[in-house]
Amino acid sequence: NLIDLAEKRKDVVVFISPRRADVVNIANSTTQAANVKNFFDGLASSSYAVFDSGYKFMFDKFNDVFRFVPLNGDIAGLCANTDQVADPFFSPGGFNRGQVRGAVKLAFNPTKAQRDILYPARINPVVAFPGQGIVLFGDKTALAKPSAFDRINVRRLFILLEKAIATAAKFQLFEFNDEFT
């Protein structure tokens, strides 16, 4: 699966949304919250994965219709945008860098009480705030145990550092590098 692949590679992060049937066309937000939590409870713990809470309703200009689309692509895009406007060690969430674009509404808009259940369960809520837009309101990786690596920005920073160190270290190969030499 993708989480195992990311764990083996150690240079990527996987962004995962819940199943469409868990949130789209379900009228009761309590049921949606339970469905989302149950789906992600079955997935492995990893700092190389990021879970979000659902789907956005947007216009598909290629087919001239509105449709629900998973938010995992948006969350990956927020990380890419964070790289452009700040640095990988900044959080992609919040009102400054976490604005989801192109969304008309959310299939599941978690309440404060639901967010308080989802976030400790490793799920980053995406929330529509009236007059303020739709925002990624979390910064968690899918790591189950408390650690610095249970934050998206910390995992992304270490991926960047590991690549930079590997690049710099290859130039020290075959150089004098011990006490004798």
Language-model-detected regions and their locations in the chain:
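Structured, hydrophobic secondary-structure cores that serve as assembly/anchoring elements
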Residues: 1-180
